[in-house]
């Protein structure tokens, strides 16, 4: 549920390595 300061509209989340995932075009973690 915490925003990772990254969007995933055109490219995947780079922050997935930190546990972030794409949700509603924005990368979130928990």
Swiss-Prot record:
Family recorded in the similarity comment: Belongs to the cyclotide family. Bracelet subfamily.
Post-translational modification: This is a cyclic peptide.
Pfam families: Cyclotide
Listed name of the protein: Cyclotide hyen-F
Chain's role: Probably participates in a plant defense mechanism.
Keywords in alphabetical order: Disulfide bond, Knottin, Plant defense
GO biological process entries: cytolysis in another organism; defense response
UniProt xrefs under InterPro entries: Cyclotide, Cyclotide_bracelet_CS, Cyclotide_sf
Lineage: Eukaryota, Viridiplantae, Streptophyta, Embryophyta, Tracheophyta
Disulfide bonds: 4-20, 8-22, 13-27
Tissue: Detected in seeds (at protein level).
Domains: entry comment: The presence of a 'disulfide through disulfide knot' structurally defines this protein as a knottin.
Cyclopeptide (Gly-Asn) cross-link, chain position(s): 1-30
Keyword Disulfide bond found: yes
The keyword Disulfide bond is assigned to this record: yes
């Amino acid at each position: 549920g915490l925003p990772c300061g990254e969007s995933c509209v055109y490219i995947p989340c780079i922050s997935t390595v930190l546990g972030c995932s794409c949700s509603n075009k924005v990368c979130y973690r928990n």
